[in-house]
A protein has these predicted regions:
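Extracytoplasmic/periplasmic/luminal assembly and interaction segments
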Residues: 51-94
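Positively charged n-region of N-terminal signal peptides that target proteins for export
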Residues: 1-6
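Surface-exposed edge beta-strand/loop patches
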Residues: 116-157
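Short, solvent-exposed, Trp/other aromatic-anchored flexible loops in extracytoplasmic proteins
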Residues: 71, 84-129, 133
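A short, sequence-level motif marking secondary-structure junctions
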Residues: 50-52, 93-97, 135-142
Length: 157
């Protein structure tokens, strides 16, 4: 009887150690997010994991642009490029008018830090059409992230 309890406790302990090791590894070995700002400071871009839990379940990443001013503006076109190749483009008409944060594209893969990412934004402000090209290359390291498996389990309840 004592021997079977010892074996059961040993198996449970090893399983717990393996789970904890995986949890720590998965939480600390995450790809970095990428960020960029326009030269005039009007726009900020971030390439990060999608926060919407339904999309996060699919391990999707999103590129969001944020308007950093209080003035009225209207987006004419947004183009997302990876290594100079257009990955997505649009006019953001599906976003609320004058939304400060706009989803540019939702990608299936995390960013590759060896690639060159740019976002070209064309907008109208005070009756004047303007264009900005934003380099998205500043790495933001993520020190600890809950693995998506754990997020999925927690979101079921």
């Amino acid at each position: 009887m004592k021997k079977s309890k010892y074996i059961l406790a040993s198996i449970f302990s090893v399983a717990l150690l393996v789970f904890l090791a995986w949890f720590i590894y998965a939480g600390t070995h995450q790809p970095p997010m990428l960020k960029g700002n326009s030269k005039d400071g009007k726009w900020s871009v971030i390439y990060s994991p999608e926060k919407d839990i339904d999309l996060a379940r699919q391990d999707l990443w999103a590129v969001h642009i944020t308007w950093k001013r209080d003035s009225e503006f209207s987006i004419k076109e947004v183009v997302f490029k990876e290594n100079g190749v257009v990955e997505a483009s649009g006019d953001a008409t599906d976003e609320p008018k004058n939304a400060k944060k706009i989803a540019v594209v939702i990608m299936g893969d995390p960013p590759n830090t060896n690639n060159d990412y740019t976002v070209e934004v064309t907008w109208e402000e005070n009756g004047k059409t303007q264009k900005d090209i934003i380099q998205v290359n500043k790495e933001i390291k993520r020190s600890f992230v809950f693995p998506n498996v754990i997020k999925r389990i927690l979101s079921l309840g």
